[in-house]
């Protein structure tokens, strides 16, 4: 038996991109299931520390580099030098779900992914915006529901778990996750990191 991660690395060094894509899909589904199981006991599996946003974002983009290149995505990353305090692996997973969602729903000849952060008096905001198919206004209030894929999203083989898990984990980490979208134009997700507080996981 060969671990899925090892298979993925093997295909990185070959031209068998079709097999690699299918392996990546399996890996992502398994990852979602594992994090779903672990999300019930986040307090037993977290380590809050100072994180440089640029390093975390770089690693997530690197993780999806093949898919981003395949879709010929124009990536605009700027102003991400801010520091936040949270758990690195959970934040990496949340960002991975958001970027993965963006890749699934790109539908333009010129696909764009924009990532930046903002610093205000009380929070650090991390914004991830794509110019994909967007979300219908009637669906927007339900995107964080478990299993909800929306009427625009069936074609992408969506599981309805990515944004649900992202929201759930943000809540557990004391972060806020906001979404804004216009159908056929864009989707923007904003992770809000409160300054100067450490979340109590017993809440």
Regions found by a protein language model. Give the residues of each.
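Short alpha-helical segment of the dimerization/phosphotransfer core of two-component systems
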Residues: 21-26
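Conserved micro-motifs of the catalytic ATP-binding
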Residues: 41-46, 79, 83-86
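Short helix-loop "hinge" at the ATP-lid/N-box region of the Bergerat-fold HATPase_c
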Residues: 102-103
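Short beta-strand/loop element within the Bergerat-fold HATPase_c
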Residues: 112-122
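Acidic ATP/Mg2+-coordinating residue in the GHKL
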Residues: 130
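Short conserved segment of the HATPase_c
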Residues: 135-147
């Amino acid at each position: 038996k060969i671990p899925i991660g090892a298979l993925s690395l093997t295909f990185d060094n070959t031209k068998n991109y079709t097999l690699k894509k299918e392996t990546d899909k399996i890996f992502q589904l398994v990852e979602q299931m594992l994090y779903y199981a672990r999300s019930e006991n986040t307090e037993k599996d977290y380590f809050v520390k100072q994180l440089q946003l640029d390093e975390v974002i770089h690693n997530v983009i690197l993780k999806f580099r093949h898919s981003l290149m395949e879709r010929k995505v124009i990536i605009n990353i700027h102003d991400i030098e801010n520091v936040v305090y949270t758990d690195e692996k959970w934040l990496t997973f949340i960002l991975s779900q958001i970027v993965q969602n963006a890749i699934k729903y790109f539908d333009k000849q010129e696909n764009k992914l924009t990532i930046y952060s903002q610093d205000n008096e009380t929070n650090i905001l991390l914004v991830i915006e794509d110019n994909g198919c967007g979300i219908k206004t009637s669906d927007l209030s339900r995107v964080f529901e478990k299993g909800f894929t929306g009427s625009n999203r069936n074609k992408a083989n969506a599981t309805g778990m990515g944004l649900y898990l992202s929201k759930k984990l943000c809540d557990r980490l004391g972060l806020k996750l906001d979404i804004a979208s216009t159908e056929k134009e864009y989707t923007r997700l904003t992770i809000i990191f409160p300054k100067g507080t450490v979340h109590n996981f017993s809440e």
